[in-house]
Amino acid sequence: MSEIIYGIHAVKALLERDPQRFIEVYVLKGREDRRLTPLIHALESIGMTIQLANRQWLDNQTEGAVHQGIIAKVKPGRQYQENDLPDLLAQVETPFLLVLDGVTDPHNLGACLRSADAAGVHAVIIPRDRSAQLNATAKKVACGAAESVPLIRVTNLARTLRLLQEYNIWVVGTAGEADHTLYQSKLTGPMALVMGAEGEGMRRLTREHCDELISIPMVGSVSSLNVSVATGVCLFEAVRQRSS
């Protein structure tokens, strides 16, 4: 069993973290640049034979996505399950988690993972039945974060939120109708930030399991932000508070 990853950042991140997963690497024939060449040399240093391919073949493998001239066939990475949560929580003193409810676009999933990694989030939690897959597109957008941030798929998100609360983790949901903003909220302790789908927001049951609802103040003419942008705004307000 194998999967495809593509893009310089995604391939480089896997090489740095889990090089034994590589099976085959394909590079665009005739392409040489200052970012790709060192990566090729690094792959060759672990014994990988680089296979050359034309652009049409690479485009077909990635269904027309921007592959930056490199794709790799790799062994699947570790799949985190909900029963991994207790061990993960036991390893950190002040858990900082991100929960995505209904984010179905792999570009948004990848962007949220990238922001989560930059913000120091310990894990991202998503439901099995209402979420984008961590496919090659999401990994490319994540720019390596898919290899560093545990992505935990859960069967029942409401049950998982209850579990987090049993571990004294404050569950903070985002909703436009919240009576206070994230800048008025205390985001310094053990917490899980819950982001809903763009437009629809969190599902009713998810919302009911939040300890607190916050909003992002909007002063312009648009009514909402892209979910990955909103996630970044909220995460880095938490980072600001937690580092002050």
UniProtKB/Swiss-Prot annotation:
SMART domains from the UniProt entry: SpoU_sub_bind
Pfam families to which the protein is assigned, alphabetical: SpoU_methylase, SpoU_sub_bind
Binding site for S-adenosyl-L-methionine: 196, 216, 225
Gene3D superfamilies in UniProt: 3.30.1330.30, 3.40.1280.10
Primary site of residence: cytoplasm
Catalytic reaction list: guanosine(2251) in 23S rRNA + S-adenosyl-L-methionine = 2'-O-methylguanosine(2251) in 23S rRNA + S-adenosyl-L-homocysteine + H(+)
Quaternary data: Homodimer.
The protein's role, per its UniProt record: Specifically methylates the ribose of guanosine 2251 in 23S rRNA.
Family of the protein in this entry: Belongs to the class IV-like SAM-binding methyltransferase superfamily. RNA methyltransferase TrmH family. RlmB subfamily.
Protein name as it appears in the record: 23S rRNA (guanosine-2'-O-)-methyltransferase RlmB
